[in-house]
Amino acid sequence: MTIAVYPASFDPITNGHLDVAARASRLFDELVLAVAHRPYKKLLFTTEQRIAMIRESVAHLPNVRVDAFSSLVVEYALEIGATVLVRGLRAATDFEHEFQMAHINHHLAPTLDTVCLMADQRFTLLSSSAVREIAAYGGDVSSFVPAHIALALKQAYQTHEESRA
């Protein structure tokens, strides 16, 4: 049984992430969307909120589960018996970073391979940070994230604005 881990902050998960996850779920017996718990990083949503949003987004994919990790991703992957890390590539700049990380990860955990999936062209310019910025200014993000996440973004920024007033 091949277990693959797709790690990211997912703050929030986007349609680009979900496209990669859906395609990766067809390649491996089990896919774990691993939400990075990074207390030192300023994130819009808590780890628990991100996990809940992702679970709702991938409920239709039977071999996908969602978990959180706070260690090195290679340590987490080995701990759960994974042999593959999944990464999505949007552009050449992503490739450079992922190429370096794949080599570092392989050095740290030689039994782990990295598989990169090219982003669907509809999502090559899509990022969580761009979605957050659009949402922060009241823009429509409904074509970039599932409806429940668009609503959560709207509510998060309304709450943020109300607390600043």
Curated annotation (Swiss-Prot):
Please name the GO terms of the biological process aspect recorded for this protein, alphabetically: coenzyme A biosynthetic process
| Localisation per UniProt entry | Cytoplasm
Keywords, in A-Z order: ATP-binding, Coenzyme A biosynthesis, Cytoplasm, Magnesium, Nucleotide-binding, Nucleotidyltransferase, Transferase
Q: Which SUPFAM superfamilies match?
A: Nucleotidylyl transferase
Q: Could you tell me what reaction this enzyme catalyses?
A: (R)-4'-phosphopantetheine + ATP + H(+) = 3'-dephospho-CoA + diphosphate
**What are the boundaries of the signal sequence?**
none
Q: Where is this site: Transition state stabilizer?
A: H17
Q: Name one GO molecular function term.
A: pantetheine-phosphate adenylyltransferase activity
Q: Which coenzymes or cofactors are required?
A: Mg(2+)
Residue positions annotated to bind substrate are S9, K41, V73, R87
The record's listing under Pfam families reads: CTP_transf_like
Q: What is its main location?
A: cytoplasm
Q: Which residues bind ATP?
A: S9, F10, H17, G88, L89, R90, E98, F123, T124, L125, L126, S127, S128, S129
Q: What is its EC number?
A: 2.7.7.3
Task: State the superkingdom.
Answer: Bacteria
Q: In which pathway does it act?
A: Cofactor biosynthesis; coenzyme A biosynthesis; CoA from (R)-pantothenate: step 4/5
**If you read the UniProt record, what top EC class would you report for this enzyme, in one word?**
transferase
A Gene Ontology cellular component where this protein is annotated is: cytoplasm
Quote the function comment for this protein: Reversibly transfers an adenylyl group from ATP to 4'-phosphopantetheine, yielding dephospho-CoA (dPCoA) and pyrophosphate.
Question: Which family does this protein fall into?
Answer: Belongs to the bacterial CoaD family.
Q: How does it assemble?
A: Homohexamer.
The protein's name is Phosphopantetheine adenylyltransferase
Q: Identify the species of origin.
A: Herpetosiphon aurantiacus (strain ATCC 23779 / DSM 785 / 114-95)
